Structures are given as structure tokens and as C-alpha cells.
Design a protein with these regions (language model features):
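Short coil-to-beta transitions that initiate beta-strands within beta-rich domains
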Residues: 155-165
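Catalytic Cys-His active-site segments of thiol-dependent hydrolases/isopeptidases
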Residues: 127-154
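Compositionally biased, intrinsically disordered low-complexity segments
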Residues: 7-8, 44, 102, 147-152
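N-terminal capping segments
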Residues: 1-83, 91-92, 137, 163-174
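Short, basic/aromatic beta-hairpin or loop at an interaction surface
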Residues: 84-101, 130
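Short, surface-exposed coil-to-beta transition loops
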Residues: 121-124
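Short alpha-helix capping/helix-loop boundary micro-motifs
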Residues: 102-110
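Loop/turn positions that initiate beta-strands
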Residues: 114-117
Length: 174
């Protein structure tokens, strides 16, 4: 059996597969937790302590009681932050700003991109799943959630295509 290495569009996920993969996390949201810095790891006490120690400036916003509540809620689940989730479903595994830097066809019109476009604001990314909706891992004490773009026009600052990772052929903007 010969080893076949896919290149170009064949190596990318199709836009509809990215959306299917993203929706899996929504359907199984009880198994997942937002945890800053997590990229798909089981949230044990040791792993959570490591992630907290790795980003002390981020975690300063929470009191020790709030951190305990976050850890209690997250314990045993698979952890993702916003970019970890987008990286898992698209294959672009990096932080939110770098995901945005890799996007093409950027626009401030949040309705201009096709389904599977990236929605962005500084420090956060999510996935447009079409029909005016998006999915993301928003913040601590949350899992994968769905939202309406129309209710978040002041939240997001742009949309773009993750062209090197997603094949948008055949995708429409609704």
C-alpha cells in the first residue's frame, strides 16, 4: 500500500464537514468546558493548575473562590478555549489572533462570508455556521454555544475565510 499525501484542496476539510464537526461539540456540550489555554485536554486538577500557572495575567481577573468554581465546573471535562475549538474543527491549531491573521477575504460586514467563515474580535474567534448563526466556546463556566450573529453585531469586528484550511467550494453565505 502506497502512502498518499493529500495536497491543496484535497488536504483541506470541506466547509460542510467543518460545520458538522463544530456542531458535534454543541450536541455533546456536557462533555466539554471552556478553559483558557486548553486545546482539547482532559481537565484534571493538575492540568488546570498548569494552565492557570502558565497565564497568571489572564487569571488575575478571578478571585480564588471564582477559580475554585471554574475548576469544580470544568473538572473531568475536555477543555477548549475559543481558538482551541476552532483549531480542532478546522485544523488551524494556533491562537485567536493568528487564526485571524491567516484569514483572507476579510470584511467588517459580518454577513458577507459564506458558511464556515471565521468571526473575530480581538481575543476571540468563532465559526459562522450559516443562516445567521455561529458556534463558539465563549468563556469560563460555559461549553460550546450557539448564537445569532444579529444579536452580536457589536461583539464581533470582522469575518474572514480560513482558506488554507477550509475548502469553501460550493458554500453560500446563507
Amino acid at each position: 500500500m502506497a502512502l498518499v499525501i493529500k495536497q491543496g484542496k484535497d488536504a483541506m476539510k470541506t466547509w460542510d464537514q467543518v460545520i458538522k464537526d463544530a456542531l458535534y461539540y454543541l450536541v455533546h456540550k456536557d462533555e466539554y468546558a471552556y478553559f483558557y489555554g486548553a486545546k482539547g485536554i482532559r481537565l484534571t486538577d493538575a492540568n488546570m493548575d498548569y494552565l492557570i500557572a502558565a497565564e497568571p495575567d489572564y487569571w488575575k481577573r478571578y478571585s480564588s473562590g471564582q477559580i475554585k468554581a471554574i475548576k469544580d465546573w470544568s473538572r473531568g471535562k475536555i477543555g477548549y478555549d475559543c481558538s482551541g475549538y476552532i483549531g480542532q474543527v478546522t485544523g488551524c491549531r494556533t491562537w485567536s489572533g493568528s487564526i485571524w491573521e491567516r484569514c483572507t477575504n476579510k470584511s467588517k460586514n459580518l454577513y458577507s462570508g459564506p458558511a464556515a467563515s471565521i468571526l473575530w474580535k480581538p481575543g476571540h474567534v468563532s465559526l459562522d455556521i450559516g443562516y445567521g448563526y455561529f458556534v463558539h466556546f465563549p468563556s469560563e463556566l460555559h461549553s460550546c454555544e450557539i448564537g445569532r450573529i444579529s444579536e452580536n453585531l457589536d461583539f464581533f469586528q470582522g469575518t474572514g475565510l480560513l482558506s488554507g484550511f477550509i475548502n469553501y467550494e460550493g458554500a453560500t453565505n446563507r
